[in-house]
Amino acid sequence: MFLGTHSPRLDEKGRIILPAKFREELASGLVLTRGQERCIYVFSEREFGRIHEQMREAPISSKQTRDYIRVFLSGASDEVPDKQGRVTIPPALRAYAGLGRELAVIGAGSRAEIWDAQAWNEYLAEKETSFSETDDAIPGIF
């Protein structure tokens, strides 16, 4: 499970050092893809395979389904961390997420997310305000 917030930097070659807590689960390989809110989703290969199977079950007669699958999968990149735990983020994904040098890598349960640090701080400041009322809006979460 991916938890916490980490603050790595993007190096000049477009690489990020994965948080130590995430490396074991991602050591054999991972998939980077576009996420909502202009972040990058990071899935273990196993979790991405599970998600892909769910997508295969979705009705392709739905235009919305086809559009989502195209955008989600066309931006995906499978990567293997090097011995130092570094992963290269493809230029197209860096541009999509507007990544600068300072990053925020957050745990989101079954996935991690890579954000530009400023974008994450702005998002968090906006969402924390309503966080205390969220349990009323999402019954059964606790």
Swiss-Prot record:
InterPro entries: MraZ, MraZ_C, MraZ_dom, MraZ_N, MraZ_sf, SpoVT-AbrB_dom, SpoVT-AbrB_sf
GO molecular function, one term: transcription cis-regulatory region binding
Cellular localisation: Cytoplasm, Nucleoid
Biological process, per Gene Ontology: negative regulation of DNA-templated transcription initiation
Keyword annotations: Cytoplasm, DNA-binding, Repeat, Transcription, Transcription regulation
Highest taxon of source: Bacteria
Subunit structure: Forms oligomers.
UniProt name for this protein: Transcriptional regulator MraZ
Organism: Arthrobacter sp. (strain FB24)
